[in-house]
Curated annotation (Swiss-Prot):
Entries under SUPFAM superfamilies matching the protein: Aconitase iron-sulfur domain, LeuD/IlvD-like
One GO MF term attached to the UniProt entry: metal ion binding
Gene coding for it: LYS4
Intracellular or extracellular location(s): Mitochondrion
Function: Catalyzes the reversible hydration of cis-homoaconitate to (2R,3S)-homoisocitrate, a step in the alpha-aminoadipate pathway for lysine biosynthesis.
Protein's UniProt keywords contain Hydrolase: no
Top enzyme category: lyase
Protein known as: Homoaconitase, mitochondrial
Bound cofactor: record note: Binds 1 [4Fe-4S] cluster per subunit.
Record keywords, A-Z: Amino-acid biosynthesis, Iron, Iron-sulfur, Lyase, Lysine biosynthesis, Metal-binding, Mitochondrion, Transit peptide
Lineage: Eukaryota, Fungi, Dikarya, Ascomycota, Pezizomycotina
Domain of life of the organism encoding this protein: Eukaryota
Organism: Chaetomium globosum (strain ATCC 6205 / CBS 148.51 / DSM 1962 / NBRC 6347 / NRRL 1970) (Soil fungus)
Binding site for [4Fe-4S] cluster: C404, C471, C474
Catalytic activity: (2R,3S)-homoisocitrate = cis-homoaconitate + H2O
Length: 797
């Protein structure tokens, strides 16, 4: 739970309103970067950025009726982004005429909800709240994909229990070995364009590659959806990312997202939903498989969604899928999820952003200026051109063509072609001595396509080690994990320290062809497919759309907006004065002055505290001095699916991949303080519950990852953002160590919405206001989390 979040669990709250007043694929495979992000550009607070008004001036807004899916160019009242339009369709209980906007808290009933190996904990939550029947079994999809190589009796029993539950409730179920859940959601048509599709996994963003609004939920949310068909969501700030140019030969979607993560690496899109856009020509250079890769890794970029438009490229892809489905499953007819009739219906009125839709920020990237690129080691925010790493002769021990990010048939074909070219008509060459190259397809159908094309056989002949279609090493499970001292390169999505094995190993990320070329050579290398366009010397990125004329117009619109806002404020104040008597008006001014005086005296307004919720929370500060501490650092993946792990063990392993000394340094009752973007990464709820198991009641950070905030709320872990405290700790303790006991004291006065810091014995004491903690959040925490809250509500029904 984070103080600035105000979830409503099963009700709708409107957080704020806004006035819109603004105007052959592998032949393209490959990023030479010599640009740096703007110095000092650190957008740490997701909700503090001034909205950028797009496309229209205030005078162009007209009260014109329009379809909710009006095409760009259609002027409507209260224009919406694509994200807002989709949420509008799946929000329930809205007041009549309400149009949702970024910042609103809404109750959503998503089209689909997928769970995977975490389904059994969801089952236990589902039953513990008193639910006996899934609200809508057509809404739920269950897949087994994470720990499929674990043949222990306990894991096999868990898998069988999950299957039995799914069968009992008539839920669509996909067994271990069928593929990764996200890929199944795509290829089976569950993630349909224009729908809100969620999963209890952080890479649900991937559905945006087929123009579905995909976003992660956590286990407790999934249980709520199973039981009631709905859960809560706050519509995030929305960023527009415009692509210009076209991908050069040898550049991939993986290179695009690595570039975005590395070049915009100051949390520009942290906790945002991203809408990708560009000209028809530009977007046609991004096939659906590349879009899936890009959307998938918007998670690593810090976003909670990343959606592409519904366009002709998507239509062609859907047509091909529908034709294959009709050929292979003629008996299904209209019951199939991907049909030509459904496609026709979709494209009769596809959702698109309105003219004048409001975006929190706008960024652009010129695809023509990209070249092959590698992320790492152990970070997606650090990236280097392949050609520069080739000159360093970095030896590798392991290579991986795995994950929902890049192990589809097209990716497997790209890797196989590296070996075919090296064969030059002769025998397929072997992987370099001392290198282990692990391959597993994103799904069984994708593997079958690769087998029919001969690509799978090429990789096996080269000496690749086959694993089942599942998550495997990407999650740090199964065979082939990185050992201490290893260097690995992977086509997956995360290379965080300890993610794919030992924290003493180094992991890089790259496209499938770069991974294959590296495995063949025994060191990081590219396949040599990149053809640099004439005149390209650097990657072109920036704020805005990349269109100087349009961006200049937007700047003018922003200036006008500021003037109009000031005028509206003055008019509003005058109207209120006129509506009141002179005495009342004088009283209002007097009260305002009194309030200011009271604030100067430190006498803050009080909020109500519900029974069972503490008025104050205090303790000694233990400081983890790092930004972007991810969920793998907080709670390693190797423990995530050990459902029988004890609370004491959780307390011992918390922060293990970040700093093993944390367990001995931190004590029950401490206040954990960390840097910015704390808790980024996966949806595992143990990142929150393990901190609670350690006896730590409150986490303070410069900012939080959205999914960690959600898990905190649902599991009754308190949190508050105090960037000033992080800055002061770093100023005072110059020597950077992973974890330190500071001797400082922290107190959160919930009733007064104020925090007080005492900087050591005899040190300075200072205070500042923080966001109010509303009653509904207090209620959830007071009863021990959302699961118990829902159970209580069900028992009262």
């Amino acid at each position: 739970m984070v103080a600035r979040f105000v979830p409503s669990a099963m009700t709708v709250l409107v957080a704020r309103r806004g006035l819109a007043m603004a105007s052959t694929r592998r032949g393209w495979r490959g990023l030479a970067v010599n640009l740096k992000p703007a110095a000092g550009r650190q957008w740490r607070q997701a909700y503090s950025t001034t909205p950028v008004r797009q496309n229209a001036l205030h005078s162009e807004i007209e009260a014109q009726a329009a379809s909710p899916f009006a095409a760009p160019g259609t002027r409507v009242q209260n224009p919406q982004t694509l994200t807002e339009k989709i949420v509008q369709r799946y929000a329930i209980g809205l007041p009549p005429g309400k149009k949702v906007k970024a910042g609103d808290y809404v109750t959503i009933s998503p089209a689909q909800c997928m769970t995977h190996d975490n389904s059994w904990p969801v089952v236990t939550k589902f039953t513990s709240i008193g639910a006996t029947k899934i609200h809508n079994n057509r809404q739920v999809v269950v897949t087994l994909d994470h720990d499929v190589q674990n043949t222990s009796e306990s894991n096999l029993k868990k898998y069988k229990n999950i299957e039995n539950f799914a069968r009992q409730h008539g839920v669509d179920f996909y067994p271990a070995g069928r593929g990764i859940g996200h890929q199944i959601m795509i290829e089976e048509g569950y993630a349909w364009p224009g729908t809100l599709t969620v999963a209890s996994d952080s890479h649900s963003n991937m559905y945006g590659g087929v123009a579905a609004l995909g976003t992660p939920v956590v286990r407790t949310d999934a249980a709520s959806i199973w039981a009631t068909g709905q859960t809560w969501w706050q519509i995030p700030p929305i960023a527009k990312v415009t692509f210009t140019g076209v991908l050069p030969r040898g550049v991939t979607g993986k290179d695009v997202i690595i570039a975005l993560c590395a070049l915009f690496n100051q949390d520009e899109v942290l906790n945002h939903a991203i809408e990708f856009t560009g000209s028809d020509l530009t977007l046609s250079s991004l096939p659906i498989d590349d879009r899936l890769t890009i959307s998938n890794m918007t998670t690593e970029w810090g976003a909670v969604a990343g959606i592409f438009p519904i366009d002709s490229t998507l239509k062609s892809w859907l047509r091909a899928k529908a034709t294959v489905s009709a050929m292979l499953n003629p008996d299904l007819g209209g019951k199939a999820r991907i049909t030509h009739d459904k496609i026709e219906e979709l494209f009769r009125d596809p959702p698109k952003p309105d003219l004048g839709a409001t975006y929190a920020k706008s960024l652009y990237l010129n695809l023509s200026t990209l070249s092959p690129f590698v992320a790492g080691p152990n970070s997606v925010k650090v990236a280097t051109p392949v050609k520069d790493l080739e000159a360093q002769n970095i030896k590798i021990n392991k290579a991986y063509l795995v994950s929902c990010t890049n192990s589809r048939a097209s990716d497997i074909a790209a890797a196989a072609n590296v070996f075919r070219e090296a064969a030059n008509g002769g025998p397929i060459p072997k992987v370099a001595p001392g290198v282990e190259f692990y391959i597993s397809a994103a799904s069984l159908p994708e593997q079958e396509i690769a087998e029919q094309a001969g690509d799978w056989r090429v990789l096996l002949d080269a000496g690749c080690i086959e694993n089942p279609a599942s998550c495997n090493a990407c999650i740090g499970l199964g065979r082939g994990l990185l050992q201490p001292g290893d260097v690995g390169i992977s086509a997956s999505n995360r290379n965080w320290n300890g993610r794919m094995g030992s924290p003493q190993a180094k992991a890089y990320l790259a496209s499938p062809e770069v991974v294959a070329a590296s495995a063949l050579k025994g060191e990081i290398a590219g396949p040599g497919w990149y053809e640099k366009p004439e005149g390209v010397e650097k990657v072109i990125i920036g704020e805005g759309t990349g269109d100087l004329e349009a961006d200049r117009a937007v700047s003018i619109a922003d200036a006008l907006e500021s003037l109009v806002a000031q005028a509206e404020s003055m008019i509003s104040s005058a109207e209120k004065s006129l509506e009141s008597s002179p005495a009342a008006a004088t009283g209002a001014v007097g009260n305002a002055m009194a309030d200011a005086t009271a604030d100067q005296a430190g006498e803050e307004g009080l909020i109500d505290i519900l029974p069972g919720f503490p008025e104050k929370v205090s303790g000694e500060i233990v400081f983890c001095d790092s930004d972007n501490i991810n969920t793998d650092g907080i709670y390693p993946g190797k423990y995530t699916y050990q459902d029988d792990i004890t609370r004491d063990t959780m307390a011992q392993v918390v922060m293990e991949n970040y700093d093993r000394s944390f367990a001995s340094l931190a004590k029950p009752g401490d206040i954990l303080v960390a840097g910015f973007n704390f808790g980024c990464g996966s949806s595992r709820e143990q990142a929150a519950t393990a901190i609670l198991a350690k006896g730590i009641p409150l986490v303070v950070a410069g900012s939080f990852g959205n999914i960690f905030s959600r898990n905190s709320i649902n599991n009754a872990l308190m949190g508050v953002e105090v960037p000033r405290l992080v800055k002061r700790l770093r100023e005072e303790f110059g020597e950077k160590v992973p974890t330190r006991r500071t001797g400082w004291r922290f107190e959160w006065d919930v009733r007064r919405s104020k925090v007080t810091v005492t900087e050591g014995e005899g040190g300075e004491t200072w205070s500042q206001k923080v966001g109010d903690l509303p009653p509904n959040v207090q209620e959830i925490i007071a009863v021990g989390g959302l699961e118990k809250w829902v159970k209580h509500r069900i028992s009262q029904a």
